[in-house]
């Protein structure tokens, strides 16, 4: 006996269902509850056990060990935090920087209410939302690029 039950094509009922395009899943075991309750957890636990075993038996280092005596001149965050880092760096008052970062999501939440009279779903026919999106994208790219420059050239990107 094999693992997969082969269909009995001599059965007239099955042949009639197959002729109508039905019955392709008529034979065999159902996925619920057999596979979902029993086989899937076994596979998931086996994969997690394999990953844990490999991590214990052959741990790989993630980068170089830290050297407290070799600190860079300016410590930069990860690339996706550059715009917020730049906002906090250029504003003289830190509370003003935090309030500015909190105002960004609040302003974004107001856009649907401002443009509620516009019934179009096409973004090119919604000028306020499109303008806010393009301005926000340009500002985030500008601030992100400026975070890599020294503080005196960060707003102009060294261009002016």
UniProtKB/Swiss-Prot annotation:
GO molecular function: electron transporter, transferring electrons within cytochrome b6/f complex of photosystem II activity; electron transporter, transferring electrons within the cyclic electron transport pathway of photosynthesis activity; oxidoreductase activity
A Gene Ontology BP annotation from the UniProt entry: photosynthetic electron transport chain
Protein localization: Cellular thylakoid membrane
UniProt membrane topology term: Multi-pass membrane protein
InterPro entries: Cyt_b/b6_C, Cyt_b/b6_C_sf, Cyt_b6/f_cplx_suIV, Cytochrome_b_C_euk/bac
Database matches in PROSITE patterns: CYTB_CTER
Cellular component GO terms held in the UniProt record: cytochrome b6f complex; plasma membrane-derived thylakoid membrane
Tagged with keyword Lyase: no
Pfam families: Cytochrom_B_C
Major location category of this protein: membrane
Spans through the membrane: 36-56, 95-115, 127-147
Acetylation in keyword set: no
Keywords: Electron transport, Membrane, Photosynthesis, Thylakoid, Transmembrane, Transmembrane helix, Transport
Domain of life: Bacteria
Function: Component of the cytochrome b6-f complex, which mediates electron transfer between photosystem II (PSII) and photosystem I (PSI), cyclic electron flow around PSI, and state transitions.
Cited PANTHER family: CYTOCHROME B (PTHR19271:SF40)
Quaternary structure annotation from Swiss-Prot or TrEMBL: The 4 large subunits of the cytochrome b6-f complex are cytochrome b6, subunit IV (17 kDa polypeptide, PetD), cytochrome f and the Rieske protein, while the 4 small subunits are PetG, PetL, PetM and PetN. The complex functions as a dimer.
NCBIfam families (UniProt xref): cytb6_f_IV
Family: Belongs to the cytochrome b family. PetD subfamily.
Protein name listed in UniProt: Cytochrome b6-f complex subunit 4
UniProt organism field: Synechocystis sp. (strain ATCC 27184 / PCC 6803 / Kazusa)
């Amino acid at each position: 006996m094999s693992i997969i039950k082969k269909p009995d094509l001599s059965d007239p009922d099955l042949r009639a269902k197959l002729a109508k395009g039905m019955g392709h899943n008529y034979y065999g075991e159902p996925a619920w509850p057999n596979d979902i309750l029993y086989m899937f957890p076994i596979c998931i636990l086996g994969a997690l056990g394999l990953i844990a075993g490999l991590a214990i038996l052959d741990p790989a280092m993630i980068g170089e060990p830290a050297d407290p005596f070799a600190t860079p001149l300016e410590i930069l965050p990860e690339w996706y935090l550059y715009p917020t880092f730049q906002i906090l760096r250029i504003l003289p008052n830190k509370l003003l920087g935090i309030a500015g970062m909190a105002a960004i999501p609040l302003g974004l939440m107001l856009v649907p209410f401002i443009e509620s009279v516009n019934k179009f779903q096409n973004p090119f026919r919604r000028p306020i939302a499109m303008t806010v999106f393009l301005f926000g994208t340009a500002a985030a790219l500008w601030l992100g690029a400026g975070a890599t420059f020294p503080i005196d050239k960060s707003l102009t990107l060294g261009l002016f």
